[in-house]
């Protein structure tokens, strides 16, 4: 298990096959219209109460993940694997937990040379940092996020915010020009860098 998990979530209580209460971390995927019959883990309220006061605008681990991505893409001549591992370790230090021995020997956490792996760990590192996870997903398409009938936009992820109503009213002429240029003012309209 990732040692950051108890910081991010609390264990849920469910019944096992014998009717006994069992506490464990239970994730619920997004995109489902019907509520599951299991009780999922909730965010850790203690962390939620203190995280906004103690999180920097850009953490050291985020800088290292950016550098790991640049190295993975061949933009800088550095070791992407070393940067990835340093980024994960820096994030664990940020949360006050130790990197478990053998953490990078696990196939689910070992650097495999892909942007996807970097972005999965960056997603965890950006927990409690406003909308940054969403921006990173929109920019890269990672991590894989399931969609389905429970997502308000159906099978499409939201890519952008709609123009505010006040702007639509107060600057109508330019708003209409912008909408015409983009194709629509819908939250599923892809942004220019997503259309390439």
Q: Where is each model-derived feature located?
A:
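Acidic/polar-rich alpha-helix caps and helix-coil junctions
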Residues: 3, 11-196
